[in-house]
Structures are given as C-alpha cells and as structure tokens.
Amino acid sequence: MSKVENKTKKLRVFEAFAGIGAQRKALEKVRKDEYEIVGLAEWYVPAIVMYQAIHNNFHTKLEYKSVSREEMIDYLENKTLSWNSKNPVSNGYWKRKKDDELKIIYNAIKLSEKEGNIFDIRDLYKRTLKNIDLLTYSFPCQDLSQQGIQKGMKRGSGTRSGLLWEIERALDSTEKNDLPKYLLMENVGALLHKKNEEELNQWKQKLESLGYQNSIEVLNAADFGSSQARRRVFMISTLNEFVELPKGDKKPKSIKKVLNKIVSEKDILNNLLKYNLTEFKKTKSNINKASLIGYSKFNSEGYVYDPEFTGPTLTASGANSRIKIKDGSNIRKMNSDETFLYIGFDSQDGKRVNEIEFLTENQKIFVCGNSISVEVLEAIIDKIGG
C-alpha cells in the first residue's frame, strides 16, 4: 500500500493519555525531526517527570532554579495532578514535599505545560483540535482489563475507562474541516469482549459519522521484533480514507536481549530457591515457562520464564509486574531498567529516569506496564505518516 503522508512534512501530534510518551519515542525513531508534539494530556506526576527526563533530559539543566518554595507550591496546587494515577492530590500535598523533590516536580510540570500539557483530559474539549494531524488516545484500561474490576466504559459512567468519551467531546467541539486526519487508539484485548461491544460499536459509528474510516486489529508486539508477547487492540481512524494497520512479520527477540549481563544482588530472589520447579513448557506464543510448586494459589504469580524465549505481557500491577526469570541456578526478577527496554525504549531512557532519586522501582515498572510497545507504534507511524 502506498504511504499516505510525505515524510518531509512535519506531523503535528497530540498525545492524549500520554504516559511516558511511547508515541513520541516511536515518532523520534521513524520521523527523526519531522514531527512536532503540539500538546498532550497527562496528570500522573511520576509519568510526567519520567516523560520530561526521557524526551528532554530536563533534570540535568533545570530551567526554573530561582523560584521560591511558596511560588512552586502555589503553582502546583492550581493544577489537576495525581500522585497515584487514580485521584487528584489532596489539599496540602505539595507542602509535604522536600525542597529538592519539589523543585524537580515543579520544573517537569512547567516544561510539560510549555509543551501543551492540559493535565486534565476533561479540558480537551476547550482546546481546538485544529492544526493537529494525529491524535493518539490510549485511554485507561483499568475498568476493562482482567487485572481490573471491569466496570466498563459506558458514556457518563464516571469510570476511568469511560474517559474515552472525552475524545468524542473534543471532536464534537471542533469544526469538521479542522478535525485531525488520523486518530490512533490502543487498549487491552478486553476492549473486544462482549461486555464492551455496545460501547465500542457506538464509538466506531460516531467516528464514521464524522467521516473517519476505521481499521482495528489485535497486534502482538512479538510480531514486530519485541522480546514481549504483548497483544493489544489498535485502531487507526483516517478521514475520508482507509489505512490498514500493519501486519507484523518480524522474529521476536528473547527476554535475555533486554536483561543486564551482570545481575545485581538485589534482583536475585533468594526466597524462591526453596521451591521446586515444574518442567518448562513452551506455549504457542514462544514463551517457555515453569511453575514454582506450592508458591502461590495464583498460577501467574508462580510462573518462572526461560530467558532464551519470548517473555509475557508486562502489566502495571499484579503478577506480571513482577516477572520472574530463570538465571542459571537462581531465579531473578526483571528490574525497572529492563522494563524500559522490554517496552521498546532505549537504555539511555532508563538511565535518565534513574537519575531522579525520588522515583521508586514500583513507579517505573508501573508506567512501563501501562505503556505501549514502541516497536508496534513505529510500524504504525511508518505506515500512516511516511
């Protein structure tokens, strides 16, 4: 199929539910300088800090050094921000932060706002979508996924997954001639379950009424050269044109390709050595795994993976946020440095994030588990944008 945009034209992109900017990372790899982030929506502070570290290396050259503590607190208190990705921070929250941490956060939020972060997705309708070529929206999966409580995504439901309809609200507030040419959605496979069928069909029909043609597929990151078997639903919606999503045909990498060659002592799970392992068995997804006998009543919590094969889906929480790997006679965990590589970021990205000392291991793995395979995004962006 012919490519539908000329790469010499800058692709103007808005990242809704931006996370750590997997879309931006893919754009950087595919289009080099031929793209522009014209705005984003993200309210989870650790993700914003990591986004700015990865894409702008902001913490090595703080732009706002001489701002008083009172001014920083006043600024942050007037933004809709979250520290847990679920709820806004409480009154007085920023006053409890130490000066060094507060300064890093303040700089990250200021720079993010400078790049067009609206923070609260519910404000997207107030911002014109004019002069945006590509709007990406990987809306929250918590109310859809098997890991979550499956409240669904009905319009007006008040669920986090129901924030999808803020995209509809923004499109409705935009003149038809000013609509973005491309809309790119990503979410978990449960989006296609019968429980969510009615809402997904409503959404597709809404887009069709605006002139979009939809291509929707389940794509596996392993088919695009990732070390991870990560199946996610993608939909590309194009104004007055059909663009087919790419079919992955690359050989997956093994888990060991993203693992540090020297294993840190803190990553070795000595407490598991007392458990015997079942025989390793290979799945259809090229995952080779065994189980710790008697370790947990939850099967996935006891899985141990062979590093010579493809790995499982990394999740933000639950058993698959704690991936266990056989390492000779030991069992080790996948650490946060490795999860950045596992989702398709570069080694320098994890190093930059590690330079910010207040970010925890759990927060780093959480954002990677919530992110999108950069390898899949590269293939999609190459097809629609070049």
UniProtKB/Swiss-Prot annotation:
It comes from the Bacteria. Its EC number is 2.1.1.37. InterPro entries: C5-MTase, C5_DNA_meth_AS, C5_MeTfrase, SAM-dependent_MTases_sf. Keywords: DNA-binding, Methyltransferase, Restriction system, S-adenosyl-L-methionine, Transferase. It is an enzyme of class 2 (transferase). GO terms for molecular function: DNA (cytosine-5-)-methyltransferase activity; DNA binding. Gene3D superfamilies: DNA Methylase, subunit A, domain 2, Vaccinia Virus protein VP39. The active site is at C141. SUPFAM superfamilies: S-adenosyl-L-methionine-dependent methyltransferases. It catalyses: a 2'-deoxycytidine in DNA + S-adenosyl-L-methionine = a 5-methyl-2'-deoxycytidine in DNA + S-adenosyl-L-homocysteine + H(+). GO terms for biological process: DNA restriction-modification system; methylation. Residues 11-386 form the SAM-dependent MTase C5-type domain. PANTHER family: TRNA (CYTOSINE(38)-C(5))-METHYLTRANSFERASE (PTHR46098:SF1). Belongs to the class I-like SAM-binding methyltransferase superfamily. C5-methyltransferase family. This de novo methylase acts completely and exclusively on CG residues in DNA; methylates unmethylated and hemi-methylated DNA. This is Orphan methyltransferase M.SssI. It comes from Spiroplasma monobiae (strain ATCC 33825 / MQ-1). The gene is sssIM.
